[in-house]
From Swiss-Prot:
Protein species of origin: Alcanivorax borkumensis (strain ATCC 700651 / DSM 11573 / NCIMB 13689 / SK2)
Domain of life of the source: Bacteria
Subunit composition and interactions: Component of the RNA degradosome, which is a multiprotein complex involved in RNA processing and mRNA degradation.
The name this protein goes by in its record: Polyribonucleotide nucleotidyltransferase
Pfam families named among the record's database cross-references: KH_1, PNPase, RNase_PH, RNase_PH_C, S1
Entry's family note: Belongs to the polyribonucleotide nucleotidyltransferase family.
Organism classification: Bacteria, Pseudomonadati, Pseudomonadota, Gammaproteobacteria, Oceanospirillales
Amino acid sequence: MFNKITKQIQFGRDTVTLETGQIARQATAAVMVRIGDTQVLVTVVGRKEANPGQNFFPLTVNYQEKTYATGRIPGGFLKREGRPSEKETLTCRLIDRPIRPLFPKGFMNEVQVVATVMSSDKNRDPDIAALIGTSAALSISGIPFSGPIGAARVGYKDGMYILNPSYSELAESALDLVVAGTEPAVLMVESEAQELSEDQMLGAVLFGHMEMQPLIQGIKEFAAEVGTETWDWKPAEQNETLKAAIKDKFAAALGEAYTITEKMARYAKVGELRDACVAEFATGEDGAPEADEVKDLFGKIEKSVVREAVVSGKPRIDGRALDAVRAIDCQVGTLAKTHGSALFTRGETQAIVTATLGGMRDAQFIDALEGSHQDHFMLQYNFPPYCVGETGFIGSPKRREIGHGRLARRGVEAVVPSVQDFPYTIRVVSEITESNGSSSMASVCGTSMALMDAGVPLTAPVAGIAMGLVKEEDGRYAVLSDILGDEDHLGDMDFKVAGTARGVTALQMDIKIEGITEEIMEKALNQANAGRLHILGEMNKAIAESRSEVSDNAPTLLTLKINPDKIRDVIGKGGATIRALTEETGCTIDIEDDGSVKIYGETREKADEAVRRVEEITAEAEVGAIYEGKVTRVVDFGAFVAIMPGTEGLLHISQIAEERVEKVTDYVNEGEIIKVKVLDVDQRGRIKLSMKEAKED
């Protein structure tokens, strides 16, 4: 019934098992990959024909984590998985980025990759298994694909690199780096680090690439055993005569257009030339080329003109040298009522970044496969259409926005204090108001300044820079600092580095071509370091270190410690006491099981009042102290007196007066306020009071 094929590959200390032929047989290809007790089903479906008029490659990647993978039932009313989580969205991008460049140019057939986590041992992140499964499924699908690729996660501890570290190992690691690539070349890097050097980061990339080689070889053997024939697909033949004619007519004008430094004016001029080209060659007559073909060839010539100018040593599009950073303007405190704000402008890229401080209850609840936890640091990135002069839909964040927000977060997270050292929930929002390349790195810079403006005690300022590469087949290449949007689009590499003056905190690399050597990566990292230090110097002119106090607009945080036995008194029956406290003082009160109390107030006065009330409720009677108390009950043998909220003591009849007391009500009555002295507190917390000794004192 099944033609099941299995392949086992030794991958470091793990065994990777690939299986096909039993599950999802109607898909173009399906592979179940297993590492330990983690199992991920990856399916690939490709259409044999492209849709008419298709002018882009419709690749879709979906990654989904099923709660049954860890033996849990989803929460919520519907009890089923909902829209993709941020983690799932980020993993979709992680899979998409290294495979997309390996499909041939001109391939417009729809391809969908679906990776489903069906079992998880909660020991390691399933994303590496999903990447491996995607590579294997594409390799046996027959779809044109220049793979396979391998993938590895790399940690770093005590001067040693760790291949595919577990969650517990990552918690103690100074690095979390994912690298993917083919046998000869690295294609993608995603990482966060604790201020490591450029050499340590490059070493991690090369270590991961070396360690994945057995995996790549194993997938090749697996594909050979499956034996699927590659599709008989050939790209459409290019009209070289037409291309030469367009080049002769428009190459020089395009070169002139790309000397216009202002983005919108340059786009307008290139648009005019494109329209003129279409009008001249796509005449609509019999035998004349279609407009789409003319536009495509015009775009190729445009790309070659810009690239040739770069590698031949001419000034860049905006007139800069290869290693020059655009003009920078930094401001803090730009928004009056926010807790912290910054305006960061670098050339035609601009971000307004805000930092908001909240209480512990404001933390984001994360329900993940490896377990639930609270996130006390959030960074959200918004890219509205107006930032590039366009109209468009504004709504929930797209994959790109989620990815850029996470990259910016990785860049600054290493310098943000722990929640134990700074017990606030922090939300940062980066609003991109102008964009012409490197907006995620502008978000890193703006975030660093906004947090310092809010009084968050960062260990060091952080800056980010995007690097680019143009590499021609003849070996000539140029590494570009602080790339423009056009340089990103027309170049061969997008290389983003964030860090402090001491080291790298985040690195993201996407390479569109093979043949990026260690020498090129080293040059890019060193050039990025110089650019980062320059940007930090410009940022320091606006704010060089965190303010000594949190913003006046931020909630005041006061902490105190109470006896854990008194927690129930603060909470009260059914939460009545703490509800009244929060409503009457306007403060948020968080109480830990160990008696730690955190009070967040809109003003210092409100927070002080809440502290006073809590101390009043939790105060313990001090032997020898005199209190004014209210008589709550009168009995034959004395009276009960409330000396503090929730605290009563017994005033025995013998302690009311010096003379013999026959009748208690001759001296005290219910509701009366009297002075009493605490004589003793026994082991059970019972308090003995004296009225006569209070009078003597």
